């Protein structure tokens, strides 16, 4: 069934928080970050029947890629109907929806623009705060959004230290797209690069303050024409991960399993136990 309570944008990443709010993005250079608060958050059958749509705004919303304190600016009412001034759109089937992109470009309802936001992941910290991670492909960044403190920070960027060199990672980090979280709460950043040169990076944020101390190259995919997507850690075995090999030149799409030897005293797939993973991915995807 078509439900139009959520604003019309170029949808990509989605993430639910512990209160069953749905976070979503507009996958565009200049796209914003949104939240949907269902009027019936605990009822699956009516969840998308109506709710409030809001856009993330830092300051007055006029500064792109901004960090710091943010607020949620509502542009629909609790039923999902457009607030005064919001832009609506009617599709060929006569379904009327709120145009999230056009609406949140308006001064009164403006959201902060980010550059091609893609995947979303969410994690709960030890203190109960939830942090939403957003990859922005064009600016080569990942942002962390603390939903309890209403603060957005740059989690990783080209200024983040490369653990292998002790220097800023620079353009070795290109096109962050997918995100994944392992059993220990570590964040992995998957690049979208052409020509089979995409890396998967392991981000170290030891104190969980929302800013990574370093990045380490975890795996590299050399399959011509392909990009890695959908990195996922096995819920039953924290030392097993899966990654898709998408649109290779050969035309043979694959799902690759990566198995690692865990470090003593850990349950997650830590870097020292992953020496040779890049080669494993290369061999299995050729």
What are these regions (language model features)?
Residues 1-260:
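Sequence/structural signature of beta-propeller domains
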Residues 283-286:
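Short, charged juxtamembrane terminal tails flanking transmembrane helices
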Residues 263-281:
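A short, hydrophobic C-terminal helix/tail in secreted or cell-surface proteins
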